Curated annotation (Swiss-Prot):
Protein name as annotated: Maximins 9/H3
Keyword set, alphabetical order: Amidation, Amphibian defense peptide, Antibiotic, Antimicrobial, Cleavage on pair of basic residues, Cytolysis, Fungicide, Hemolysis, Secreted, Signal
Maturation propeptide residues: 19-43, 74-123
Record's GO cellular component terms: extracellular region
Keyword Secreted: yes
Cleavable signal peptide: 1-18
Positions where Tyrosine amide occurs in the chain: 70
Length: 144
């Protein structure tokens, strides 16, 4: 009778352990799904933000170019226009299909993705703001 009791208790322990392992696997898969959803949200916000920045910047560049394209430009204004065109190419190069974006971000945690996105923002927005400031300063000097 002791042997039957030991076998029954062992079976109960083994089945409880199997259930806990199964529950752990389910919770891990649920966490993976939640992480994927969070990554998609982060990417969506980033795309919308960059899209807005690109649209605004393109409109500004077109207005700036239309005002100064047909007039005489100084060497400094020519350099500013070349830099603006280079920045526009950089902004266009950030457009990736979603699959490539998922491949790049797979394996990163959310903090690493946010840091990478912030670095890209700083790399692009810093020179853009400087060039726009210089261009506006030059226009104000000419007007004033």
């Amino acid at each position: 009778m002791n042997f039957k009791y030991i076998v029954a208790v062992s079976f109960l322990i083994a089945s409880a352990y199997a259930r806990s392992v199964k529950n752990d696997e389910q919770s891990l898969s649920q966490r993976d799904v939640l992480e994927e959803e969070s990554l998609r949200e982060i990417r969506g916000i980033g795309r919308k933000f960059l899209g807005g920045v690109k649209t605004t910047f393109r409109c500004g560049v077109k207005d700036f170019a239309s005002k100064h394209l047909y007039g005489k430009r100084t060497a400094e204004e020519h350099e500013v226009m070349k830099r603006l065109e280079a920045i526009m190419r950089d902004l266009d190069s950030l457009d990736h299909p979603e699959e490539a974006s998922e491949r790049e971000t797979r394996g990163f945690n959310q903090d690493e993705i946010a840091n990478l996105f912030t670095k890209k923002e700083k790399r692009i927005l810093g020179p853009v703001l400087g060039l726009v400031g210089n261009a506006l300063g030059g226009l104000i000097k000419k007007i004033g």
